[in-house]
Amino acid sequence: MFVPRSLKIKRSSNDDLKSGEAKKSKPEAGGLQVEGDRDTPVHTSVTEEAVTADKPGHASSTNSPSCQLAEVSSTGPDEGVKDSHPSEEPVKSFSKTQRWPEPGEPVCVVCGRYGEYICDKTDEDVCSLECKAKHLLQVKEGEGSLRPSSPQRVAAEPESPLDAFYVYKEHPFIVTLKEDQIETLKQQLGISVQGQDVARPIIDFEHCGFPETLNQNLKKSGYEVPTPIQMQMIPVGLLGRDILASADTGSGKTAAFLLPVIIRAFSEDKTPSALILTPTRELAIQIERQAKELMSGLPRMKTVLLVGGLPLPPQLYRLRQHVKVIIATPGRLLDIIKQSSVSLSGIKIVVVDEADTMLKMGFQQQVLDVLEHTPGDCQTILVSATIPDSIEQLTDQLLHNPVRIITGDKNLPCASVRQIILWVEDPAKKKKLFEILNDQKLFKPPVLVFVDCKLGADLLSEAVQKITGLNSTSIHSEKSQVERRDILKGLLEGDYEVVVSTGVLGRGLDLVNVKLVVNFDMPSSMDEYVHQVGRVGRLGQNGTAITFINNNSKRLFWDVAKRVKPTGSILPPQLLNSPYLHEQKRKEQQKDRQTQNSLVTGANLMDIIRKHEKSSSQK
């Protein structure tokens, strides 16, 4: 069958055969290459015996490739035939029992684990009996040639052309609408667009003319009517334009960029052809899950997830399987690029999701380094919940003749979220949280509680479980990737009534079943506040966000008042009467007046001339 990469064979538990005398020589055709111990001179040979791995004592068939075992023994110059050592480790039956490879070690051509054995039929590396059988079945059925087991650069490789090439054309109904009707529609939906020759918004997914398989996938995934950001962003993206998009959290931005990505990748005959960059593993995992749902049934459409915190070998193995869409965090993708394990020369569309988070987390240079390896003419889409000045600068740097699409207020929380601001001093926070969790009107599990430190998350989760009896857990960056994934799955499936989190769940994740968020600690910026509040109100659903505030957040008082009060929320008197708020307001108004005075307009032109003449006469 195969031999391990050592002198002694790992024998199956029912193998009672004995090895014969051997000489260390190159095997004949059909034999196996075996490496000897360089420190001890030995002579080896290879013989093959048919055994049954699953049924002891059962006669094996020479036609069954998974039942053949190559046997090797070591003898000195004067030694006779000896039995294998009774403690010899048996050949691994299942791939899950094999470890992951270390750098430079052989990799199983089937699953990407450590390639401990060499298949006697193909000379390829495999990790177990299970993968050997799968490997030979693939060869027999002619499903494609196997990839080399060693790390290898994945270049953009051509595939067979698609049977049908998709081209977006405006639906006849959209074409018949007058310009004033389109503008009225945009105003009613809160869509703001800047750019030249911008495509008209769609009103229904059917207006896109997608392949029927994709239309069915949209319905199965619960997409019935496009949201405002989807109405405008999808047709613009389908036409290949660069985009800067901003919308309320939970407004459907992910599907808005996934559909153009899928169509572009589906239409291209090179792999990989699309790249999506995200700041966190959790967000990347979620995006890949949504992408797979929408791609289901589309031929040759594969994704690969390249993120830190998960084993690298299976990611590299998946990358070699002619994937169309790469979903990655910048750091892991850069590592793979530096290993020359992937080429991005065939990329036609790039999406940078949660771009504001990328910049805040210090990933800007990593993003730029990744994009240097993509073609200069590829379509680029920047997506963000907020648009600070740094995003504007990045837009000027990366996008060519972009279309700017904004729905809602680009820096305000989602309108479907009821916001409650409570003045709570630090010693009273736990008591107030327990009151909320015991309030039948407010408590709607699962509840997401945000804190500002990892230790605080663990301690608060334990306190909630002890005092209220609710099933509670904590999640933060020190939890392993497996733990975080299981907690997130449990949150989505309703296994937890309360989840206490640091900012790890504050961005991008679709937690559609969360109806109540409590900001136990006020976020350090209003951008973070917008994102954490946005964990409720997903896709227009109503939700409640309660925030505890006190003088520890005094530098944000005026920002809170400006952004939250217009939504109709009642602010606590301690906040409204705070001297810090009034001082911040005064400084901002003074700065605005200075800016206005520095501008020359028809209204102030004469005043500026008089001031200039007066100052000149005094000199």
From Swiss-Prot:
Chief subcellular location: cytoplasm
Binding sites annotated in the UniProt record for ATP: A247, D248, T249, G250, S251, G252, K253, T254
Domain Helicase ATP-binding: 234-405
Domain of life: Eukaryota
Biased composition (Basic and acidic residues): 12-27, 79-91, 583-594
Motif (DEAD box): 353-356
Coiled coil: none
Protein name, per record: Probable ATP-dependent RNA helicase DDX59
Primary gene name: Ddx59
